[in-house]
Curated annotation (Swiss-Prot):
Signal sequence, start to end: none
Residues where mRNA binds: Y10, Y33, R102, V103, D104, W105, D106, R113, Q114, Y115, G116, R117, Q123, V124
Source domain of life: Eukaryota
UniProt-recorded name of the protein: Nuclear cap-binding protein subunit 2
Residue intervals of the RRM domain: 30-108
Gene Ontology MF term list: RNA cap binding
Gene Ontology CC, one term: nucleus
Keywords attached to this entry: mRNA processing, mRNA splicing, Nucleus, RNA-binding, RNA-mediated gene silencing
Organism expressing this protein natively: Drosophila erecta
A Pfam family of this chain: RRM_1
InterPro entries assigned: NCBP2 (IPR027157), NCBP2_RRM (IPR034148), Nucleotide-bd_a/b_plait_sf (IPR012677), RBD_domain_sf (IPR035979), RRM_dom (IPR000504)
Primary location group: nucleus
Function, in words: Component of the cap-binding complex (CBC), which binds co-transcriptionally to the 5' cap of pre-mRNAs and is involved in various processes such as pre-mRNA splicing and RNA-mediated gene silencing (RNAi). The CBC complex is involved in miRNA-mediated RNA interference via its interaction with Ars2 and is required for primary microRNAs (miRNAs) processing. Also involved in innate immunity via the short interfering RNAs (siRNAs) processing machinery by restricting the viral RNA production.
Family statement: Belongs to the RRM NCBP2 family.
Length: 154
């Protein structure tokens, strides 16, 4: 494996199995995790970009677990490992919807993983963000709840 397709240090804490089983799955996987997407990026845009590296088997958009709206990540699965490696090499760090996207190996999509794991339904990283990011819903979710006016007592 060349340097650009090596495994990162990230490991899914919810993986069902040992650390060595997870690493074995990652080394043979044809599935990629794609992060730092705009909430407005479409499946079609992702397909257009990733299909430049090979035949995409499936794209699974990450969704807010309560609202069922896009929340800034997806999984892209190829039919063959070499094409996934090409995407790791050439797509990781490129711009999509004016955002630098991150691509990492994934052990393989399992139903339920398409939902954000944060308390408010989206990704954990978007809950604690203190900066304004229009492509990811504005301010962080927890900060937005603190500064939003309470409309229950009117």
């Amino acid at each position: 494996m060349s340097a650009s397709v090596e495994l990162s240090s990230y490991r899914d804490q919810h993986f069902k199995g040992s650390r060595s089983e997870q690493e074995r799955s990652l080394r043979g996987s044809c599935t990629l995790y794609v992060g730092n997407l705009s909430f407005y990026t479409t499946e079609e845009q992702i397909h257009e970009l990733f299909s430049r590296c090979g035949d995409v088997r499936v794209i699974v958009m990450g969704l807010d677990k309560y609202k069922k709206t896009p929340c800034g990540f997806c999984f892209v699965e190829y039919y063959v490992r070499a094409e996934a490696e090409a995407a790791m090499r050439f797509v990781n760090g490129t711009r999509l919807d004016d955002r630098l996207i991150r691509v990492d190996w994934d052990a393989g999509f399992i139903e339920g993983r398409q939902y954000g794991r944060g308390k408010t339904g989206g990704q954990v990283r978007d809950e604690y963000r203190t900066d304004y990011d229009a492509g990811r819903g504005g301010y962080g979710k927890l900060l937005s709840q603190k500064i939003a006016p309470n409309t229950d007592n009117r």
